[in-house]
Amino acid sequence: EGEQLKFTGIPSFAPELLKSVSSTDPMKGKNLEKALIQFAEEGAAKLFKPMIGSGFIVGVVGPLQFEVLASRIKIEYGIPVRFETTQFTSARWISGPLVTLDEFSRVNKGHMAEDNDGDPVFLTRLQWDVERVERDYPDLKLNSVKQMMI
């Protein structure tokens, strides 16, 4: 009695493809952000906001999803978009002691982002990036699956 229960929800898997997204109409940037957040909440894609820069990175499982997203954003929000290749090939949710995580984020700003829930994400270019983190920061954990708590 009186204890707080947490239930595990549906796991969220790291996307296999990452691309930056932008509107071809510069006047619709704010609307694009709303559209991307909506699709991330639906689970249609993962949305990452890099620590550096003003854009977004969208992650999906298959290449056709980019075309579907572009079409839905155009039809439902009236925003023409383009997806472009990024330097990143994977995303990993990162967790660990706050002090270590803060230091890591500061040193690796160019690889850090937040997901739609505000959780820290490490964007990687190569498997070597993951191995380096595991070697240099043993207190941190990189996860390819995010457990959703409800």
Show which residues each predicted segment covers.
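Structural and coupling elements of P-loop NTPases
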Residues: 1-150
